[in-house]
Design a protein with these regions (language model features):
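Bacterial Sec-dependent N-terminal signal peptides
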Residues: 1-28
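Low-complexity, Pro/Ser/Thr- and charge-rich linker/hinge segments at domain boundaries
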Residues: 30, 226-250, 336-375
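Aromatic (Trp/Tyr) and acidic
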Residues: 47-193, 242-243, 249-331, 345, ...
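Surface-exposed, short loops/turns at beta-strand junctions within beta-sandwich domains
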Residues: 198-206, 318-323
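Short acidic/polar inter-strand loop motif in beta-rich domains
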Residues: 215-221, 332-338
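Short coil/linker segments at helix-helix boundaries
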Residues: 452-484, 521, 541-558
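Carboxylate/His-rich catalytic cores and anion/metal-binding grooves
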Residues: 475-499
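Solenoid-like repeat scaffolds
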Residues: 620-626
C-alpha cells in the first residue's frame, strides 16, 4: 500500500503529513536519472550510490490575488565543494587547463577513473578542491503548465464543493545557482519556479482548500491551503526587510506581480492595506493603496523602458511611527516579510552588517571568530612565503586601472611585462576585491566615505562597536576600518613620496583555489600621479578626522605622508601632460586624473590651510572634474578660508546634482537614484543594489531639506527587499537575501557566503548578456519566459557565476552602501 503525500499549508508554512517517500518517484527511478549520460562532465551528479534523488519541493503557497494562487517550487541543490589533502591515485589523470602568460600552471584538473574529481591547488599542489555536484530532480515543466494536472476542492466553499481545475496556469522559472566549475558554458543548475493558478472563483477567507497536483511529482502530491491573507506571505507584497527609524519621514512598501508568461497582474486602485503587529497579530494602521507606476508607462532611467512589466502600487504608511516588529498586509492578497520600526534593528543593524562585509575583505590577517563566522587563514603575507615583486607598470597604464594609453589588452599584460626582481616586503594588508584578490587604490573610496561619516557625526560613531580586532584600542572602530585599508599604501610609499597603485597577481585566481593558496606571481604597481592623488586625498582626510577626535600625533603621521604624496604627484603630472605621448592618452583617463587632483587639493587645503592647494582646487574646478566629495569639503570650509562666491559655487554644485537626483527618482517606478544618465541599469554601476547616491546625503546634511531625505529613503527601499523579488541585495540581512555572491574563498571551502556583501544586482539582460553570449544562451534556455525577456527589476539570478550580477567591489558596492545606511542611522 502506498502512502499518499500531503502538505498542510497556512501562515506561510508547509507541514508534510504522512511523507515517507515519494511513491511516484519509486515507481521508476531510471526515468529520473537525467544525468546518467553526462557523468563525465564537471558539475554532474556523483556516481550512483543507490540514494534516491530528491524531487522538487514546495517552498511557499500564497495568493497574489483572491483568484490567483502562487505555488513556489524549488528544484535541485548543490553539494558543496570541500578542500582535502590530495593523495594521488594511480588512476588519476592530471590536465593543465590554464596557464598564465608566464607559463605558471594555475588550473590543474584531476580525473579519477574517468570521473572529474576536482582541482589541485595551492603551493606544492598538496590540496584537492572537490568539484561541486548537482543533486535532485528538475521540475517537469510540461506537467506544471497543464491546467488538467491541478484540482481544487473544499467542503467549506460551495463554489469548490466539487473538484475544479484552474482556468489557466502561468509560470516564471529561473536558475538559482550554478556549480562553480560549471558556471561558464555549463548545463547544470538549481531552479525556482513560480506557478500561478488562475482559479475559477474567488477564495473565501478562513476556508481550507485541498489542492492536488500528483502529476508534478513533487515532495507532496497534494496540500491543504488555508486562505488567510492577513497571515500568509505573498510574493506580490514587497517591503523593506531592513525597516525604518520611527522618525523616517517616508515609509513605503509596494504591491506588484509579474507572472512570467502570464504578464503583469492589474490590481484595482484603492485597495486597503494594514500594518499588523508580529507579536499580537493586531492591526495597528490602515491605509489605501495608490498607483505608483503603470506597466505600460516607460521609465525615465536606463534604456527608458518599463523595468517592471507590471503595475506598481504604493503602500504609504509614513505617518505610522510606533516602534515594533510588523508585517504589511494587503486586503485579499497577503503579507510582506516582517520588518522593524525602531532605531537599533534597522539602519544601524544594516550599517554594521555592511561594515562586517568590508572587514571580511581584509587581506593579510586571519579571519575567524569572534570577529566573523567566516573562517580563513592569513592571506598574502610575506611571513607565509608570499613574495611581491615590483612591476614597472603603473595602475594608470594597466587595464585594471585607467589603461591611459590603451595599450593593455588583457588587464595583466602590461603588469607582467614590467616585472622586475625587486621585492616589496611592505606589500601586505589592505582590502581585497571580490572574485579577485587584488588590492587597488581605488578601494580607498570606501575609506574616504567611512571617514566622512566620522567627520559628520563623531559623537555617534565613536561609540559604535564593529567587533573587529582593533575594538579595544583608543580609536573609533569606523576609523580603524578606514585606516586598515589605507595603511598598506603608506607602508608602500616611496621615500620621495610616490604612491604605488596596489597589488595584483599575474592572472585571475586559479580555478578552485582560495586567497591563501596563490601560486601565481604577485606584483606591486609602480607609483603614478593618479594613485598618489587618490592617496593624498584620503590620507589628508584621515589626518583631519584624527584631529577632530583628538589624536593629533597620529594625525601628523598621515598629514606628512599626504603632503609628501601630493608634492611628488604635481611635477609628475606636469611631466605627463607635457610629454609627446600625452596626445594618445584616452579622454576618460584625463578626466579621472583631473577629478582626483581636484579632490586631493580640496582635502589638503582644508587640512593644511596652505593657499597653494586652494589655488589648485579653484584652477581645476569644473563640471567634469569636481565631484560632490570635493564640493562638500569646500562648501563647509570656514568663511575665513574662502571667497563667498567660490563657496557658493561649491554648494550650488551639490544642490544642483541633488535636485537632478530627486527628479530622476520621480522618473523611476522604485525611486532609484544610482542610475547614470544614458546607461543601461545594472552591471558594474550596481544601479539597483547601491541604496542611493551619496550626493543626496551631502545635500540633506547641508540644508536639512526633507525632500532630499525622503528621496534617500525612497531610493534605499529596493536594495532592502522592497522589490519584485522580495530579495535583500546584501548577504546576511533580512529573511530573504542573496545567497551566492561571487566569493571564492567560501565557495571553494564549502562555507556560507560572509555577511555584508552587496552584489551588483539586477540588470537589463538584453544589454549585459549580449546575443550569442554564454549567459544569454543559458538564461534564455533556463528561464521561463526567456531570460532576455524578463523585466530588469526582477532580473537578478543568484547563480554565483555571473560577475555583472553576482560580484561586487569594495569601492563601488560596499563603501557607498555602508555610507548610506550609516547616515540614515546617525542623521538628525
Amino acid at each position: 500500500m502506498q502512502l499518499k503525500t500531503f502538505c498542510f499549508i497556512t501562515s506561510a508554512f508547509i507541514i508534510l503529513t504522512g511523507y515517507l517517500h515519494n511513491p511516484l518517484y519509486a515507481q521508476d527511478k531510471s526515468k529520473y536519472d537525467i544525468f546518467s549520460s553526462s557523468r563525465e562532465k564537471v558539475g554532474a551528479p556523483l556516481p550512483s550510490t543507490g540514494t534516491e534523488q530528491s524531487p522538487p519541493w514546495i517552498g511557499n503557497v500564497a495568493t497574489i490575488a483572491p483568484d490567483v494562487l502562487c505555488i513556489e517550487v524549488d528544484a535541485c541543490r548543490i553539494l558543496s565543494s570541500v578542500q582535502i589533502p590530495y593523495q594521488k591515485d594511480p588512476a588519476d589523470i592530471l590536465t593543465i587547463i590554464h596557464s598564465s602568460s608566464l607559463g605558471e600552471e594555475n588550473a590543474i584538473r584531476v580525473v579519477r577513473n574517468g570521473f572529474p574529481l576536482g582541482m589541485i591547488v595551492g603551493p606544492g599542489r598538496k590540496t584537492l578542491t572537490i568539484f561541486e555536484r548537482i543533486a535532485g530532480i528538475h521540475l517537469n515543466t510540461n506537467a506544471a503548465d497543464n491546467p488538467a494536472n491541478y484540482t481544487i476542492i473544499s467542503s467549506g466553499d460551495n463554489n469548490y464543493i466539487h473538484k475544479l481545475m484552474p482556468s489557466a496556469v502561468w509560470r516564471k522559472s529561473k536558475p538559482t545557482n550554478y556549480p562553480e566549475e560549471n558556471r561558464h558554458y555549463g548545463e547544470y543548475y538549481t531552479a525556482k519556479h513560480f506557478i500561478y493558478l488562475k482559479l475559477p472563483y474567488l477564495l473565501k477567507p478562513g476556508v481550507t482548500y485541498l489542492v492536488s497536483l500528483p502529476e508534478l511529482e513533487l515532495n507532496c502530491s497534494a496540500f491543504y491551503y488555508v486562505y488567510d491573507p492577513s497571515f500568509v506571505r505573498s510574493e506580490a507584497v514587497h517591503a523593506s526587510q531592513i525597516g525604518f527609524r520611527s522618525d523616517d519621514p517616508e515609509k513605503n512598501a509596494f504591491l506588484s506581480s509579474w507572472m512570467g508568461n502570464g504578464g503583469g497582474y492589474k490590481y484595482p486602485e484603492n485597495l486597503e492595506f494594514s500594518i499588523i503587529d508580529e507579536k499580537t497579530n493586531e492591526k495597528q494602521f490602515s491605509g489605501k493603496a495608490v498607483m505608483q507606476w503603470r506597466k505600460d508607462d516607460p521609465e525615465g532611467i536606463g534604456t527608458k523602458v518599463n523595468h517592471t512589466q507590471a503595475d506598481v502600487i504604493r503602500l504609504d504608511f509614513s505617518n505610522f511611527n510606533t516602534p515594533g516588529k510588523y508585517r504589511i498586509c494587503v486586503e485579499g492578497i497577503g503579507c510582506s516579510y516582517p520588518f522593524y520600526i525602531d532605531s537599533t534593528n534597522t539602519w544601524l543593524k544594516a550599517f554594521k552588517v555592511s561594515m562586517k562585509g568590508h572587514f571580511n575583505q581584509r587581506s593579510g590577517i586571519p579571519l575567524l571568530p569572534p570577529y566573523t563566522d567566516f573562517v580563513r587563514p592569513r592571506s598574502f603575507h610575506p611571513e607565509d612565503g608570499v613574495k611581491v615583486y615590483q612591476s614597472s607598470c603603473s595602475l594608470l597604464n594597466s587595464g585594471n586601472g585607467l589603461n591611459a594609453l590603451g595599450t593593455d589588452k588583457d588587464n595583466f599584460g602590461n603588469l607582467v611585462a614590467g616585472r622586475t626582481d625587486e621585492l616589496v616586503p611592505e606589500a601586505w594588508g589592505g582590502t581585497m576585491d571580490a572574485g579577485d584578490w587584488d588590492r587597488r587604490i581605488k578601494h580607498l573610496n570606501s575609506s574616504r566615505l567611512y571617514l566622512e561619516l566620522m567627520e559628520l557625526y563623531p559623537d555617534y560613531f565613536k561609540n559604535i562597536c564593529l567587533n573587529i580586532p582593533e575594538s579595544d584600542n583608543d580609536l573609533p572602530d569606523l576609523v580603524d576600518e578606514a585606516l586598515y585599508g589605507l595603511d598598506i599604501y603608506r607602508r608602500m610609499q616611496l621615500p620621495d613620496g610616490g604612491i604605488r597603485g596596489g597589488i595584483e597577481s599575474s592572472e585571475h585566481p586559479a580555478e578552485g583555489s582560495a586567497s591563501w593558496q596563490e601560486v601565481l606571481s604577485v606584483y606591486a604597481y609602480a607609483p603614478d600621479h593618479w594613485s598618489s592623488y587618490i592617496y593624498a586625498g584620503v590620507a589628508a582626510r584621515a589626518a583631519y578626522v584624527l584631529k577632530i577626535i583628538g589624536k593629533t600625533e597620529q594625525a601628523k603621521i598621515w598629514e606628512e605622508s599626504a603632503v609628501k604624496a601630493m608634492k611628488w604627484a604635481e611635477p609628475e603630472y606636469d611631466r605627463w601632460i607635457n610629454e609627446p605621448g600625452f596626445s594618445k592618452v584616452v579622454p576618460s583617463a584625463k578626466i579621472q586624473v583631473s577629478i582626483e587632483r581636484n579632490l586631493a587639493a580640496a582635502e589638503l587645503y582644508r587640512l593644511t590651510k596652505d593657499n597653494q592647494w586652494d589655488e589648485l582646487y579653484l584652477a581645476t574646478r569644473n563640471v567634469q572634474t569636481t565631484r560632490t566629495d570635493a564640493a562638500f569639503i569646500y562648501g563647509r570650509l570656514d568663511k575665513s578660508m574662502v571667497n563667498k562666491k567660490d563657496q557658493k559655487i561649491a554648494l550650488d554644485t551639490i544642490l544642483k546634482k541633488a535636485d537632478r537626483l530627486v527628479d530622476e527618482s520621480m522618473r523611476s517606478a522604485y525611486g532609484l537614484t544610482s542610475a547614470i544618465p544614458g546607461r543601461a541599469l545594472g552591471g558594474w554601476e550596481s544601479t539597483y543594489s547601491i541604496p542611493a547616491s551619496p550626493t543626496l546625503v551631502r545635500a540633506h546634511f547641508l540644508t536639512g531639506n526633507a525632500t532630499y531625505l525622503k528621496t534617500l529613503l525612497r531610493s534605499a527601499l529596493f536594495s532592502a527587499g522592497a522589490n519584485p523579488m522580495n530579495l535583500v541585495l546584501t548577504t546576511g540581512l533580512g529573511e530573504n537575501c542573496v545567497q551566492h555572491p561571487l566569493h571564492e574563498d567560501t565557495r571553494h571551502t564549502g562555507q556560507p557566503a560572509p555577511i555584508g556583501l552587496t552584489v551588483c544586482g539586477p540588470c537589463e539582460v538584453p544589454v549585459f548578456a549580449k546575443p550569442g553570449s554564454d549567459m544569454r544562451e543559458r538564461l534564455d534556455l533556463e528561464c521561463t519566459p526567456k531570460g532576455s525577456e524578463w523585466p530588469s527589476a526582477e532580473s537578478y539570478f543568484d547563480v554565483y557565476g555571473w560577475d555583472l550580477e553576482n560580484e561586487y567591489v569594495v569601492d563601488r558596492n560596499l563603501g557607498p552602501t555602508a555610507y548610506i545606511w550609516g547616515y540614515l542611522a546617525a542623521r538628525r
